[in-house]
Amino acid sequence: MLNGGHDDPASIRIRAGALTARIEAGALRTIQAGGIEAVRQVYAAVRDHNWSTIPGELTDIDLEQSDDGVRYAYTSTHRSGDVHFVWHGEIIGSSRDNTLTFIFDGEAKSDFRANRVGFCVLHPGDIAGQPCTILHTDGASEEAGFPADIMPHQPFFDVRAITHETANGARVTVTMEGDTFETEDQRNWTDASFKTYCTPLALPYPRMIAAGTRIRQVVTISAVMPPDAPSVTSDDDDDAQVVMTVTGATVPVPRIGLCVNADGAPITLSEAATLRTLRPAHLRLDLHPAAPDAHARYAQAASQARALDSGLLVALHLTDDADAELGRVADWTHEQDPPLDAWLIFKASSPGTPAALVNKARNVLSRFQVPVGSGTNGYFTELNRHRPDASGLDFVAYSVNPQVHAFDNASLVETLQTQGDTVRSAAAFTGKPVVVSPVTLHIRWNPNATSDDPPTPPGQLPRQVDTRQLSQFGAAWTLGSIKHLAEAGASAITYYELTGWLGVMERETGSPLPALFPSEPGQPYPLFDVLRSVNEFAGGTIRVMRSSAPLRAVGLVLERGGSMRIMLANFINDYVDVRIPGFLETTLEPYAVVIADGQSNG
């Protein structure tokens, strides 16, 4: 399976004078001014009371293009649970004045609670540190800048327009009407962008939207080109050869492990034999000592760690009764004598962990002589906003998933470089080794939910499940994640679970819904081979490698004991020509992972 059924949307290339863009699934993407990306995306979102994005179904599509410009119109219908919202979109491009105008005009067809309905504008993350001008709703302007470091909270409030200059001297202004907008640093969630969104978060949410409520917003992108700007002949370079350059910089291969099955499913002898070949450095157990089955789950995880020759990373979720819970855990540890790797201390259901709780845990657990870390069970956002007192920590930790805001293949790939940025940022403000644990393709839990999600209807996959788990795309994405996290200096990374829909292989019993998740009983998924191939170089080094087109293909170079392994990943549903000067030249098939072994000359 190439992409788990997640096909790339049809893409329409449009031009409005010096501005070029693509229309995909009703959104404007890769808006360039004179061939240089100025705005990554403009799209409209309907998000319910739990921040779940309600997808839209597009109908009544109409496209007109000429030398004078473009007009693209459609209707988008969003229905899920209580939510029923319909809006009409219109994208108008004018070649005469280099403008793209996006109109959102919608009506609620039901009463529902929502956290956001309307436009979001994404500026690319690589303009971090660049100056900009903010026009506020009262007409006042402010000279500002996109933050270089990942900013915990919003850099810009009360926004009507943002103007910045691209590398080729184009002055690009994005004007937003119909609501008050503000900007957040989406790198917190590994999105490679700064998002300017409608409806300030300081206002109470969720808000009730009554049937019949109309919402209209307009976003206009305009560009003033320098007099000597060259004419645009192409809006991208999709067919160019990707050149990868091996640098002299090196980092250690991180210790890569897996999570035990969250549903408590055991592993069979045959599954254990297969998993042992992956050589996981650790197994992560999320242990809630107050839960009735905590003792049994601890014993099971200890047994699995021994069976796989792995260490046990115990993530303790402690409540206000932490003294009693730590006492029980200490007793169970003496009883089980597991191959401990480390302790990870969390305050249960909290975005951060108080230093006093970490110190209390260290006092009880230090007798077992393994590292004690903390941070957050949530995203880097929570770590950044609730920065721990790292003086009593051996490492800091946070989790990653690429689908907090967007769900298409291209957006998932865009998160990969930003994953590395979060590691560098966490290391900078804590001064401690960084453990990224776990990395999953989809959300495990929502730290910002205002209520529980409804149960999964019969015959449907749970929200946490993504069919790209068993796809070639999933393998390529996993290699990209390892590359960027490792090259940024992550000391350890936890990926996925052992078996099943969220694991690295299917269970012997097979998929409970084979029509929706078409795996083969007992078979490893393609991402299994990626993890195994990297772990075969455990204790070695990684030579940092740069790609000329990191959203199309990247590579990872591993070395140990005179041996070298080059692993290449193709992120797109097309063939990609790759050249590594002095090493190899090849063509990658769609979503392929290619491995080449040789001798190290370093």
List PLM regions with ranges.
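Noncatalytic carbohydrate-binding groove/subsite architecture in carbohydrate-active enzymes
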Residues: 349-472
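Polysaccharide-binding surfaces and accessory modules of carbohydrate-active proteins
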Residues: 99-177
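Carbohydrate-binding surface patches
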Residues: 547-581
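Catalytic domains of carbohydrate-active enzymes, especially glycoside hydrolases
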Residues: 259-292, 304-313, 336
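Extended, loop-rich substrate-binding clefts of extracytoplasmic carbohydrate-active enzymes
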Residues: 48-106, 184-186, 190-193
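Beta-strand-rich recognition/accessory modules
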Residues: 43, 77-81, 163-241
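Aromatic/acidic polysaccharide-binding cleft in carbohydrate-active enzymes
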Residues: 212, 437-526
